[in-house]
Amino acid sequence: MAEAERIIGTPDIPDAAGEGQERPDADPEREQQEQEQAPERTRGKRRVAVLFAVALFAYLLDLGSKMLVVAKLEHHEPIEIIGDWLRFAAIRNAGAAFGFGEAFTIIFTVIAAAVIVVIARLARKLHSLPWAIALGLLLGGALGNLTDRIFRAPGVFEGAVVDFIAPKHFAVFNLADSAIVCGGILIVILSFRGLDPDGTVHKD
């Protein structure tokens, strides 16, 4: 009798080994959905890591090149790389990429900051490797020029960007500008191909 009462009074709960009946609040469909989404979340995290790795590489390359140019080229004669066709010459640019809009330094600073915020928001839904590379180039380039605008003379948010790559019959630019242009071109190509940042493909 005591044995029967003990059996009847024992609740159906998992034992120490994790065995027993299923929890009343368990949702098999939800658990299956979470298991299916787990690889997708992992892939998304990897794409975000690629984005920031590309951005960091572009940013450090731009920053290092500018520091070297300021130390070795500023107030010195330009260095000819390919005759007159390509030279390195230190130029302070208060405008946008390739020397455009020098009277709107603060506006371009705000635009660069807005681009960084937009990229950070897109990163949350990023599942495409090409998009990760493109956005990483944009982010690294925007950060590179924004750093100049914040920390260089004549003042905060009005600083002049250091440009030094001077092709013949073309505007002087820097590596941050190159990263921004390459990232923009890649985004245009991806958009024409119908590939979205979340990895979905649209075919017309």
Curated annotation (Swiss-Prot):
Organism, as annotated: Streptomyces coelicolor (strain ATCC BAA-471 / A3(2) / M145)
Coiled coil region boundaries: none
Function: This protein specifically catalyzes the removal of signal peptides from prolipoproteins.
Residues passing through the membrane, by range: 50-70, 100-120, 126-146, 170-190
Catalytic activity: Release of signal peptides from bacterial membrane prolipoproteins. Hydrolyzes -Xaa-Yaa-Zaa-|-(S,diacylglyceryl)Cys-, in which Xaa is hydrophobic (preferably Leu), and Yaa (Ala or Ser) and Zaa (Gly or Ala) have small, neutral side chains
Gene Ontology CC terms: plasma membrane
EC number: 3.4.23.36
Active-site residue numbers: D163, D177
Upper lineage: Bacteria, Bacillati, Actinomycetota, Actinomycetes, Kitasatosporales
Name used for this protein in its record: Lipoprotein signal peptidase
UniProt region (Disordered), positions on chain: 1-42
Keywords assigned by UniProt, alphabetized: Aspartyl protease, Cell membrane, Hydrolase, Membrane, Protease, Transmembrane, Transmembrane helix
Pathway participation: Protein modification; lipoprotein biosynthesis (signal peptide cleavage)
UniProt topology in membrane: Multi-pass membrane protein
Location(s), subcellular: Cell membrane
